[in-house]
UniProtKB/Swiss-Prot annotation:
It is found in: Cytoplasm. The gene is metK. Belongs to the AdoMet synthase family. It comes from Streptococcus gordonii (strain Challis / ATCC 35105 / BCRC 15272 / CH1 / DL1 / V288). One of its GO terms (cellular component) is cytoplasm. GO terms for molecular function: ATP binding; magnesium ion binding; methionine adenosyltransferase activity. This is S-adenosylmethionine synthase. ATP binds at residues 16, 175-177, 242-243, 251, 257-258, 274, 278. Pathway: Amino-acid biosynthesis; S-adenosyl-L-methionine biosynthesis; S-adenosyl-L-methionine from L-methionine: step 1/1. Its cofactor is Mg(2+); K(+).
Amino acid sequence: MSERKLFTSESVSEGHPDKIADQISDAILDAVLSQDPDAHVAAETAVYTGSVHVFGEISTTAYVDINRVVRDTIAEIGYTNTEYGFSAETVGVHPSLVEQSPDIAQGVNEALEVRGNADQDPLDLIGAGDQGLMFGFAVDETPELMPLPISLSHKLVRRLAELRKSGEISYLRPDAKSQVTVEYDENDHPVRVDTVVISTQHDPEATNEEIHRDVIEKVIKAVIPAQYLDDKTKFFINPTGRFVIGGPQGDSGLTGRKIIVDTYGGYARHGGGAFSGKDATKVDRSASYAARYIAKNIVAAGLAKKAEVQLAYAIGVAQPVSVRIDTFGTGIVAESKLQEAVRQIFDLRPAGIIQMLDLKRPIYRQTAAYGHMGRTDIDLPWEKTDKVQALKEHLA
């Protein structure tokens, strides 16, 4: 009998407390970048019942009305009713942002490679904003080259938000979570969905029966291809029996607490650094995007069915200290040759990544819910496959 394996990933909606915090942090980043593309930003947010605290470091010439950005973001998510215990108009906003440390700025603004060197490459000017390791991943399980469990999990909570905002399911409230368990065959190909868990906040009048019916018919069956569902697929819809109190009234939220949701749902490794609220000189963010860009182009080029890319940096140094590629035995060329090609084709210095992916633009708020990778609903530069031909030619 062939061996079957299960793998599970989860996602959360834009109304989840941690995701509210991520979206506020990225909305502040976008507001700053729209005026000052060269700003350095590290904006953290904490949310809880009736209160939002924004803190961190910013170096910029821009003026941003933090209070307005916070309230507008909360309203766009859907927290406009005081019954939710957290409302855009009544929430208390407490900003506490200071200037970036000059010790850090020294290494970011002038990388080790150019200090005391008159003959300098402009792209060597920016050093990494911190040490660290970052991962990117791609696999041919879905058209967007993402693992199927996280792809479906994101689509489920995004569908809930669409139905809530359109009014088609009027009793839905903003907070929600999804979880999908996929069964794989002995060749690591997804064959069916074993279990779907959805917890969605709702008005008190909604019955469990109508929630169960609507979620299965209008969410699960609308999102998950019929080929993956069978009579053995298990559905757990609001398994606690009631989910009226939610959002920051139910749990506090912090920026950067959903890093696995933001990436590959646990299917690939993670370096530990969060994304939201950070400008692109922070390699936690920009190098993770670059690593995804590399991995996706490798798989799109047919050079491997699965690819994981690790990049690592030293603070204040432009060039990565290491580049590693793992194709898990699915590659058609040696990994050493892939690594050589990647170093030739992709500029992995922070300034090179920023230029390559055009990361000084205010594009980040849209990434702060429903995943930073594999998005098909928005246009993100690290999701392009425009290096496929260059990789093929280099390795020919």
